[in-house]
Amino acid sequence: MASRSLCSDPNCLFKVDWFFFHLSARPVQIKKGGDRMISKSRSTLQIVEEQVRKWQYTTTGQKAVKPKITVVTISREPGSGGNLVAQGLAEKLGLDLFHQQVIHEMAKSANVSTRFVQTLDEKAMNVLDEWIAALVDDRHLWPDQYLQHLMRVVGIIGQHGSAVMVGRGANFIVPPEKRMRVRVIAPMAFRIKHVATTFKVPPKIARRRVVRTNSDRRAFIRKYFNADIDDPVNYDLIINTGTTGIEPAVDAIIAALGRSKDILRQAA
């Protein structure tokens, strides 16, 4: 019997992953001091232009600050509720939330990459380019056009900070001094039940979807970052939501960061 081949096209991998975005990321508006969260309900162009305006506003007259953690990246096992953890964290800390499908859509567009570049000064852009070059060299990557745009888009979001980024290998792209890398996991039985209950599908189908998506995410990280998505050394904090639940998981991340008012803030 022929085995199912994993699609090498990032768009194909993304289509499979889309199901699990819907698993725990219903159209939710997280209020952030009057700002809107980075939501899938708006077009990519609208999201980009809104974010660019916000960055331009917040950086005007901003004083230089020492590097510190300004981004939380969240990798998650399918069905573990990682998207809910990301949403809860963004809500409690007042951060921009970039879901994996938004990052994916941005990375597909050369125009988005160019537009984002315009939000950084030459010095900041040079620093980012040097970091990306070092990342490519250290991990022996062969970046295609998609990965080039992905690294630039995620890197620029990381430079501006005050963000939670879900998936797309963001934990490998954002420089160490700027991010905390979180991995959300749960037992297989928990994840199957979560999927089956949420989508009202039989456990057999839920299990198939969990296994398939997990395989495709693993293939994506292996292909683009030459890394193992399940390797614990790729994360600073690993949380089992099957044990903790969603809210305690959010609180655990905040506790690990330190006092929330002192973390993930850009000096005005």
Q: At which residue positions do the language-model features occur?
A:
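Short, Lys/Arg-enriched N-terminal segments with co-localized hydrophobic residues
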Residues: 7-36
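Extreme N-terminal, non-catalytic leader segments
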Residues: 29, 33-69
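Small-molecule kinase domains that catalyze NTP-dependent phosphoryl transfer to phosphate-bearing small molecules
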Residues: 54, 127-129, 203-247
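Pre-Walker A (Motif I) flank of P-loop NTPase domains
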Residues: 67-72, 161
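Glycine-rich phosphate-binding P-loop
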Residues: 74-89
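Short beta-strand-centered segment that lines the nucleotide-binding/catalytic pocket of NTP-utilizing
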Residues: 96-107
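ATP-dependent small-molecule kinase phosphotransfer cores
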Residues: 107-162
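Conserved phosphate-donor/acceptor-positioning beta-strand/loop module used by diverse small-molecule
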Residues: 177-197, 203-211
